[in-house]
Amino acid sequence: LPWFANFEMAQMTRFGMPGVWTHAYVDMWSPGYLGFMASNHNGMLRMYETYGNGGATTMKRKVESEEGPRPRATSREWYRPLPPYKEVEWSMRNNTNYMETGVLCGLDLTSAFPKVVLENFYRKSRNSIESGKKDAPFGYVIPAGQRDPTRVDFVVNTLRLQGIEVGRAKSEIRLEEGTFPAGSF
């Protein structure tokens, strides 16, 4: 992932798109983004976060200042070679342009190195099978009695749609990590 992220950032910086940076790599598991399910099949998720807008209207926006909740948002850093301007005219079209450009840069890199990308996918898949045979965790437990069972059903059904084996405990489960009631997934 850093290979793609760094290439995309370098290309977009080269195109003169201020405010592009790569930072805060993720561990590929978040129940908040359905796209993370791609990692269950060793796929590669591309996620672009862009500066939002209140609507489709172009407006003058102030990027967080040096003293704001995220200090130095406009400073030059190793991962942010072309920082955003302190104030910008911004619209939803800018969001679309930035995200589309990132995707197209990633596709360009893939088309330039298809064998490398395919080999990396194969190795990642092979390594995940081997580590799944010998390294914990071998599974996860979603304890029964969750406050919102519809969310549990959503996660479980999404995992099943991905071809991931999900079982339901018919009786209490006792593990080193704790005891889980019948009905746990």
Regions found by a protein language model. Give the residues of each.
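Intrinsic-disorder/low-complexity accessory segments
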Residues: L1-S30, L34-F185
